[in-house]
Amino acid sequence: MIPDVSQALAWLEKHPQALKGIQRGLERETLRVNADGTLATTGHPEALGSALTHKWITTDFAEALLEFITPVDGDIEHMLTFMRDLHRYTARNMCDERMWPLSMPCYIAEGQDIELAQYGTSNTGRFKTLYREGLKNRYGALMQTISGVHYNFSLPMAFWQAKCGDISGADAKEKISAGYFRVIRNYYRFGWVIPYLFGASPAICSSFLQGKPTSLPFEKTECGMYYLPYATSLRLSDLGYTNKSQSNLGITFNDLYEYVAGLKQAIKTPSEEYAKIGIEKDGKRLQINSNVLQIENELYAPIRPKRVTRSGESPSDALLRGGIEYIEVRSLDINPFSPIGVDEQQVRFLDLFMVWCALADAPEMSSSELACTRVNWNRVILEGRKPGLTLGIGCETAQFPLPQVGKDLFRDLKRVAQTLDSINGGEAYQKVCDELVACFDNPDLTFSARILRSMIDTGIGGTGKAFAEAYRNLLREEPLEILREEDFVAEREASERRQQEMEAADTEPFAVWLEKHA
């Protein structure tokens, strides 16, 4: 089932320096909660400055949903320590609140009013909050409070030059973009390995169902927790953060211009369903527009091609301008066993897997084959640890045992690991391979199995509160290592100044400005 990568691996072993200079970055979301696990109703902590313009700490959907962002980094340890510093400073500056350590929220009552993230009075800030109002009215606020980790990854120019020859200008844009689309297609075909290993949401609180019927065969504990015994990541299931209305958009990942055209079409295509919500009610705007996507960021995807945008530029226009610059992996649940929601083992595994995805052949995929890849993902998400589970290739009928496919993949990853270790020194990547490959013969070692054991004992709420309390105490005590207190104070002041400048620079009323941007 795994493509034959032997020639590409032999090429890599002859060109190990092609992997010198991999760049990455991390984003981690987490809900602010009270000691009893309920959602914090306070505003964004003052010490964290402006959520609109802060470089490292912002908010996602809700005012209580923090998002930590590391700068681009070539050093894994430095990046993780930077992320930990963001958590340490925040833990010391959120009064009696904690950071929820799980992807799935728990103590949120049906119909509870969840305050949307607030970004001040600038047109840009108001637009961001209105976008979130649209998300709430389309999908419900509860779904939007699910948290995850995003891993951003780029291969060095040396890799593309070794692989594609001496490239520059438009030629580089085309070839590098084609290379990253290969990564994305392989990710759709084989990325289910990520929830298998690291999925950590095998259960949900009963409040999450909100009384809606479900066809999933949940088991229920006495404390009202619903779980699937072999599930890995309900966050990635249809119960979690996915979007059925987008499944027939037909967006493909074969060609830059085709992809961008599909995305631009989706933000112009009217939706009958969303038109029923209306645009405005009693003088209050309900969504930016009633199209299938309000803006491009609404497209739900487990992986995204990205380029840093310039001021006023849409993500797709940035891609058209310069091609794909990096990949954003979006299938990681919060790691409940780490105070910062992600750890070194995961980052090293993702490095290996992304390099493998760049090397393995990836035939072009139609939108129907893309839909077929979802079958494997759903199997792993809902019953990934089930004995005897099999997976298929695309829309073909042949089935292969998951443990065997996993071990075949890791045989390749071990060779990538040897190459990365040869240029970085040590055996850190090979050690990760040895640790993780054991999960295929013993699913009890996976994150989902480990966290489910705790959840069955103490419930999701009990597990979440215990981890949150332990991490709060730990982070508050740890000294900063890379950033200093004065760096945070300076960024707080600079972010507030940037927000004020944006507000002062606006000359048009929001309604007029919105007509041009909706």
From Swiss-Prot:
EC number: 6.3.2.2
TM ranges: none
Record pathway: Sulfur metabolism; glutathione biosynthesis; glutathione from L-cysteine and L-glutamate: step 1/2
Any one of the GO BP annotations: glutathione biosynthetic process
The keyword ATP-binding is assigned to this record: yes
Gene3D superfamilies: 3.30.590.20
InterPro entries in alphabetical order: Gln_synth/guanido_kin_cat_dom (IPR014746), Glu_cys_ligase (IPR007370), Glut_cys_ligase (IPR006334)
Substrates-to-products reaction catalysed: L-cysteine + L-glutamate + ATP = gamma-L-glutamyl-L-cysteine + ADP + phosphate + H(+)
Any GO MF annotation of the entry: metal ion binding
Keywords of the record: ATP-binding, Glutathione biosynthesis, Ligase, Nucleotide-binding
Family annotation (Pfam families): Glu_cys_ligase
Cellular component aspect of the GO annotation: cytosol
Family: Belongs to the glutamate--cysteine ligase type 1 family. Type 1 subfamily.
Name of the protein: Glutamate--cysteine ligase
Source organism of the structure: Escherichia coli O8 (strain IAI1)
